[in-house]
C-alpha cells in the first residue's frame, strides 16, 4: 500500500509492506527497507505471541537497514485489531515496551474499521520528515572563524 501525505510544500510517500511476520520475506528485507526514514511495527492485539515478536522484527529491521545511529532511528508501534473484543495484550506491557525504546509512539488501530490509522500515518510522516530535515541540516558544514593577527616585527637596536 502506498499513501501520500502532504507536509507543507513537501510530499511524503509512505510505502507499507505487510509481511505478516512471514520468514519468507526476510531475504527481501534490504530492498524493502532501503532509504526508509521511519518504520511502523504492527502487532495483533489479540495475540501475545505477535507482541513478543515486535522486538525481533525491530532488531531484524535495524540489522538489515543498518542506520548510522540505531538508537535514534524512528519507530512507531501499531497494535492492530482494536475493534475485536478479545484483546489479550496488556496496555501496561505496551507502554513499558514503548518507554524502553525512546518513548516510541503507539497507536491502537483497526485496519478493518480505519481506527487511528490516519493519525498514526500522519505521526510516522512527521517523524520521517523531521528525520530527513535534520539529516539535510547535518550536511551543512559548521562555519568556524579564525582570527588571524600579524605580529609586529621586533625593533632591533641598542635599547630593544
Residue spans of the language-model regions?
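The beta1-alpha1 cofactor-binding region of Rossmann-like NAD(H)/NADP(H)-dependent oxidoreductases
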Residues: 19-22, 47-48, 114
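Switch I (G2) and immediately adjacent beta-strands of P-loop GTPase domains
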Residues: 1-28, 34
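Conserved Walker B
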Residues: 20, 45-46, 61, 82
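Conserved P-loop small GTPase signature centered on TRAFAC-class small GTPases
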Residues: 4-11, 63-160
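Generic recognition of short, well-ordered alpha-helical segments
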Residues: 27-31, 52-56, 88-92, 119-120
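Conserved beta-strand segments of the P-loop GTPase G domain that flank and frequently precede/overlap
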Residues: 16-17, 40-44, 77-80, 108-109
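Inter-motif core of Ras-like GTPase G domains
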Residues: 25-48, 54, 64
